[in-house]
Amino acid sequence: MGTRYFLVGFLILLVLGFEAQGAHVPQQDEASSPALLTKMQKSLLGYWDTAKAAAHKLYKKTYLPTVDEKIRDIYSKSTAAVTTYAGIITDQVFSILSGED
């Protein structure tokens, strides 16, 4: 019983600590923030487009149907496994937090 309350209390204090740290951030100038954000967004989108185009070219150059089929099979199996284990972990966390024995 004590460890459950300790875990819940620890998580609450952790969240409150992060909220308190975020509260002391000084306010930025409203006029300069959107321009900087826009520049960063355009730059990141440019990098993303370049990387996506390079990956697409590499994929087209090295495309093999058997490898593609194996990759799709591995992807479907791994996502099924991750979904299963995520469900198990979610159930365990819910069980710990709700206090069911």
From Swiss-Prot:
Residues 66-74 are annotated as: Lipid binding. One of its GO terms (biological process) is positive regulation of phospholipid catabolic process. Proapolipoprotein C-II is synthesized as a sialic acid containing glycoprotein which is subsequently desialylated prior to its proteolytic processing. Proapolipoprotein C-II, the major form found in plasma undergoes proteolytic cleavage of its N-terminal hexapeptide to generate apolipoprotein C-II, which occurs as the minor form in plasma. It is found in: Secreted. One of its GO terms (molecular function) is phospholipase activator activity. GO terms for cellular component: chylomicron; high-density lipoprotein particle; low-density lipoprotein particle; very-low-density lipoprotein particle. The keyword Secreted applies. Keywords: Chylomicron, Glycoprotein, HDL, LDL, Lipid degradation, Lipid metabolism, Lipid transport, Secreted, Sialic acid, Signal, Transport, VLDL. Residues 1-22 form the signal peptide. Gene3D superfamilies: Apolipoprotein C-II. Residues 78-101 are annotated as: Lipoprotein lipase cofactor. It comes from the Eukaryota. Belongs to the apolipoprotein C2 family. PANTHER family: APOLIPOPROTEIN C-II. Component of chylomicrons, very low-density lipoproteins (VLDL), low-density lipoproteins (LDL), and high-density lipoproteins (HDL) in plasma. Plays an important role in lipoprotein metabolism as an activator of lipoprotein lipase. Both proapolipoprotein C-II and apolipoprotein C-II can activate lipoprotein lipase. This is Apolipoprotein C-II. It comes from Capra hircus aegagrus. The gene is APOC2.
